[in-house]
Amino acid sequence: MNQSETLFAQAKTVIPGGVNSPVRAFNGVGGSPIFFTRGEGAYLFDEDDKKYIDYVASWGSMILGHTNQAVIIAVKTTLENGLGFGAPTQIETKLAEKVCELMPSIELVRMVSSGTEATMSAIRLARGHTGRDKIIKFEGCYHGHSDSLLIKAGSGALTLGVPTSPGVPKDFAKHTLTLEYNNIDQVCEVLSEVGAEVACIIVEPVAGNMNCIPPIDGFLQVLRELCDEYGVILVFDEVMTGFRVALGGAQAFYNVKPDLTTLGKVIGGGLPVGAFGGKREIMQSIAPLGPVYQAGTLSGNPISMSAGLVMLNVLSKDENFYTILNTKVQKLTKGILAKAKENNIGMTANVVGGMFGLFFTDSQSVTNFKETSQCNIELFKKFFHLMLAEGVYMAPSAYEAGFVSSAHSDTDIQNTIDAAGRAFIKLT
């Protein structure tokens, strides 16, 4: 038994399932999770000091790699003055100004402590501002674990949905319509029936929790047009894509302006943080300016704010940052696909900016949750463990996107491609 297995057994005695977030338990791939002790650049090191090339990047947060010194120095400097005050600080305003500068759709922004808190608050704000109760979300898009968003689709577009977790009252389902991602006709159909009752449409502009699924041509643009037509607030959940696929997020990448945006991950430099923001007229409905209540003891924590500000400053200084990052992702995925083809293994890939998805399928494209579920999940599980043995750490689920950081070198990318080649040989 290695150190990770020993620690996992110990963790299970005091933590439900031994983890503080379910995907970490390796239930999606089998086996025991790896316990890490440190990160450095593109690498993670486990309790036995084995080194891994990391493509999870703390679920997308570590776009500069682990222990980036600019971020570390900012955090150390800030914490020497105190861990938090529960009161306003200048650094909150500076980060808010930077977010508004980089994302023009955001005129006012409120800091919170997680992505779930951001989406939950944005939904409440949309309902409070419009006076409507219904929301539309899309199958396979994850927006955190608040009750309103843990609803799966019914048998038809307007059929009552079903909670995806015990503990979520069935009454919540009547207010949440879950549609197929990238299905424009279905959105048109539903809005034509109940558009006057819908407060908002919330969508991951690039879905990252059914692996990596980009929007088909026109999907986001039509959502924008339909929301304008029916007076519905368009919410982009950019917790994953914000500052990851482009400096201005997916909304800049696809040139579509939402009314509200939720943020997390990169905006905190790797520390716990979230944010939601958007049009001034909508954001002014939030307390203390308006009647929609939202609050948080740790919101705007100065350590998280300082890490996020340095992160965004670094990203915005290099105009070639995202071009270089995408070049790395393209090299990685094209190399892996070539190795798969050499071994007669069906595989396709999706790439947007600094994120990617690999799918074991003979299909040329994967565009929604149903198509992701039809991929060869069992083959992915075997591939995951073969890559782990090669010292490559990928997301422990066929439904999670992968991420490259600026710290990944050409050698890291090539070593990963070579490792995939050896793994494919063992799969055949």
UniProtKB/Swiss-Prot annotation:
GO annotation, biological process: protoporphyrinogen IX biosynthetic process
Entry keyword set: Cytoplasm, Isomerase, Porphyrin biosynthesis, Pyridoxal phosphate
Transmembrane segments: none
InterPro entries: 4pyrrol_synth_GluAld_NH2Trfase, Aminotrans_3, Aminotrans_3_PPA_site, PyrdxlP-dep_Trfase, PyrdxlP-dep_Trfase_major, PyrdxlP-dep_Trfase_small
Cellular component terms (Gene Ontology): cytoplasm
Primary location recorded for the protein, binned into one broad class: cytoplasm
Oxidoreductase is among the record's keywords: no
One Gene Ontology molecular-function label: glutamate-1-semialdehyde 2,1-aminomutase activity
Reaction catalysis annotation: (S)-4-amino-5-oxopentanoate = 5-aminolevulinate
Pathway it works in: Porphyrin-containing compound metabolism; protoporphyrin-IX biosynthesis; 5-aminolevulinate from L-glutamyl-tRNA(Glu): step 2/2
EC number of the protein: 5.4.3.8
Residues bearing the modification N6-(pyridoxal phosphate)lysine: K265
Cofactor: pyridoxal 5'-phosphate
Subcellular location: Cytoplasm
UniProt-listed Pfam families: Aminotran_3
Family, similarity comment: Belongs to the class-III pyridoxal-phosphate-dependent aminotransferase family. HemL subfamily.
Oligomer and partners: Homodimer.
UniProt xrefs under PANTHER family: GLUTAMATE-1-SEMIALDEHYDE 2,1-AMINOMUTASE, GLUTAMATE-1-SEMIALDEHYDE 2,1-AMINOMUTASE 1, CHLOROPLASTIC-RELATED
Name recorded for this polypeptide: Glutamate-1-semialdehyde 2,1-aminomutase
Species assigned in the record: Ruthia magnifica subsp. Calyptogena magnifica
